[in-house]
Amino acid sequence: MAKITFIGAGSTVFAKNLLGDILSFPDLANSEIALFDIDAERLRTSEVVANRVAEALDAHPTITATTDRRQALEGADYSICMIQVAGYKPGTVVDFEIPKKYGLRQTIADTLGIGGIMRGLRTIPV
């Protein structure tokens, strides 16, 4: 059984979608899923959502949630880094507001356009 660790699991929507994709593969449906985030409240929400996704897919993963990064990564076969450097505010807001100020349209996609470049410059060093 594979252990898959989500780093930055407090991003509930992204975690939900990614977990749904992972658990849809029979070989991964019984994986150990370790959710990690520094924000305990958001992490708890993601844990509840993860359990609902597993139930909806009739998958039976072992889901754990922790604010201890080392614990989450211990024994992991795969780790998925989903952190957002600077968070929603100011990070994402600035990624949209600066292009808007100069008449440029920033799409929702995280890695496209001027906002995507700014996000990349914040995230790549991490």
Language model segments and positions:
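N-terminal Rossmann-like dinucleotide-binding module
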Residues: 2-29
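Residues at the starts of beta-strands that form the adenosine-phosphate
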Residues: 3, 32, 62
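Phosphate/oxyanion-binding active-site loops and adjacent basic polyanion-contact surfaces
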Residues: 11-15, 42-46, 119-126
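Short, solvent-exposed loop/turn and secondary-structure capping segments
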Residues: 16-17, 46, 90-93
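NAD(P)-binding Rossmann-fold cofactor-contacting core
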Residues: 27-53
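Short acidic low-complexity segments
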Residues: 62-75
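N-terminal Rossmann-like NAD(P) cofactor-binding module of classical short-chain dehydrogenase/reductase
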Residues: 73, 77-83
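Rossmann-fold NAD(P)-binding glycine/threonine-rich loop
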Residues: 85-126
